[in-house]
Curated annotation (Swiss-Prot):
PANTHER family: NEUROTRANSMITTER GATED ION CHANNEL (PTHR18945). Residues 20-249, 298-308, 461-473 are extracellular. Glycans are attached at residues 29, 105, 151. Pentamer. GO terms for cellular component: chloride channel complex; postsynaptic membrane. This is Glycine receptor subunit beta-type 4. Residues 1-19 form the signal peptide. It is a multi-pass membrane protein. Belongs to the ligand-gated ion channel (TC 1.A.9) family. Glycine receptor (TC 1.A.9.3) subfamily. It comes from Caenorhabditis elegans. Disulfide bonds join 166-180. The chain crosses the membrane at residues 250-271, 277-297, 309-329, 440-460. The keyword Ion transport applies.
Length: 473
């Protein structure tokens, strides 16, 4: 009984294994039959034609040009690089043409996925004239397909990644707009043999999810043209991309920091004219910081002789900072030049008048004018600056009632005292003039910078922006 059960179990297992094997063999056979059917359809067509020449375009026997209709779907697009003058684009590229030699009686279109089989058919040798590099996608299978319709229409679809050359006009950078084109033409067939046309009313479609960090795709223009070469005239199709540069990044990274640096340089106008270390260090620091900022802005640009909008901005900001340094130099020179002729401390004229008044009071108290005040020790015109300053700071000069100040009887002549006071007044007058220059600078520098901003932004955003750059292919 047990042996019978064991035999039945073994027999059942063998049937399952054999049945599964037959199933997989059947599935492989079906797949192979389907592939053979597709290949047989194409080879049968080629055999029926007999002398099919894959190197001859379809209408060669009629001496007519073959029309190739093209269209594309832009899957992705990267930034437009100003330094390398190119951009990357990922597209699905479709071509359609009619080859009457491939007409067949099938009710449905024939799908061709084998690159070798597609190589047996004639197809246009289109290429992208201004592409630096181009590559097909092969993951997980070669990304292409071919449909052959009963009337001989051939539809070819593939996915291509391109690095496209774009000669940009950077005169308005970074407030610029660019026109970059993608030019398509045949390599071997001229206009008498092959004519390229855009297919349908909207042959260039764009993935709406495309986002570029520094550019905005405004619109796409497409047209056909005739290119003249020494060997003849070639038909070509052009897709022209109009892009605007995003300015937000440049405002945050360049325009706002440099504007703040210029404003900081104006702080020196509120410092005292004799605060030399503070004003010099402030001017030099702002100038060096602005130079560093300008160098960083130029690193993303090619070395070109054209004057760009960012160059105008950086140069003007540097001129404002340098002008602030010159203003301080002029003011400080005026003050110091007068000090060298007769250095007097601030309020020195008032001190002289006080000394004269005190002297007259003391003089009335002395009988017969035994001792009289002499200014000459403290106000000698030929003494150096440091000595004059120290003499006026001495206690003996400030306290006129001490006997040590009365060194001789003779009074200082009125004419000499007048000369000293005139010199002191001129020092004070020049100091006030220097302060007046600072006050004017506090208003004129910001006003000039505001006027520059108005003209700068109006010109580059409105006037210069109305002239779109010409497409260079």
């Amino acid at each position: 009984m047990h042996s019978l059960f064991l035999k039945i179990l073994i027999y059942s297992l063998m049937q399952c294994v054999l049945g599964q094997a037959e199933f997989w063999d059947y599935d492989e056979n079906v797949t192979q039959i389907e592939e053979d059917f597709k290949i047989d359809d194409v080879t049968r067509i080629l055999k029926r034609v007999g002398n099919y020449n894959r190197n001859a375009y379809p209408l060669l026997d009629q001496d007519l040009a073959t029309h190739v209709d093209i269209q594309m779907y832009i899957e992705g697009m990267s930034s437009f690089h100003a330094q390398s003058m190119d951009f990357q684009v990922d597209i699905y590229f479709q071509e359609k043409w009619v080859d009457h030699r491939l007409q067949h009686n099938n009710t449905k279109r024939i799908l061709v996925k084998d690159p070798k089989l597609f190589g047996l058919l004639w197809h246009p040798d289109l290429y992208f004239a201004n592409a630096r590099t181009a590559s097909f996608h092969d993951v997980t299978q070669p990304n292409f397909l071919v449909w052959i319709y009963p009337n001989g229409t051939v539809w070819y679809d593939c996915r291509i990644s391109l690095t496209v050359l774009c000669m940009q006009d950077l005169a308005r950078y970074p407030l610029d707009s660019q026109n970059c084109g993608l030019r398509i033409l045949s390599y071997a067939y001229d206009e008498e043999q092959l004519i390229i046309r855009w297919n349908g009313g909207n042959p260039v479609e764009v993935n709406r999810g495309i986002r570029m960090p520094d550019m905005h795709l405004k619109h796409i223009k497409f047209y056909t043209k005739r290119d003249k070469y020494a060997t003849g005239i070639w038909s070509s199709a052009v897709a022209e991309f109009h892009v605007d540069r995003e300015i937000t990044h440049h405002i945050i990274q360049s325009y706002i920091p440099t504007s703040l640096i210029v404003i900081i340089s104006w702080f020196s106008f509120w410092l005292d004219v004799e605060a030399v270390p503070g004003r010099v260090s402030l001017s030099i620091t702002t100038l060096l910081t602005l130079a560093t900022q300008s160098s960083a802005a130029r690193m993303a640009l090619p070395q070109a002789s054209d004057v760009k909008a960012i160059d105008v901005w950086m140069g003007t900001c540097m001129a404002f900072v340098f002008s602030a340094m010159i203003e301080f130099t002029v003011v400080n020179y005026c003050v110091r030049r007068k000090v060298r002729t007769k250095i007097k401390p601030r309020g020195l004229s008032e001190q002289v008048h006080d000394m004269v008044a005190q002297y007259r009071e003391k003089k009335d108290k002395f009988n017969n004018g035994n001792c009289e005040i002499s200014y000459e020790m403290a106000l000698q015109p030929n003494e150096d600056n440091a000595t004059v300053q120290r003499n006026f700071e001495k206690k003996e000069v400030r306290e006129m009632n001490q006997a040590s100040l009365f060194v001789r009887r003779s009074l200082l002549p009125t004419s000499k005292r007048k000369t000293i006071e005139d010199r002191i007044n001129r020092v004070e007058e020049n100091r006030k003039n220097a302060q007046k220059i600072d006050r004017y600078s506090r208003a004129l520098f910001p006003l000039a910078f505001i006027i520059f901003n108005i003209f700068y932004w109006i010109y580059y955003l409105k006037y210069a922006g109305s002239n779109s750059p010409e497409l260079l292919l």
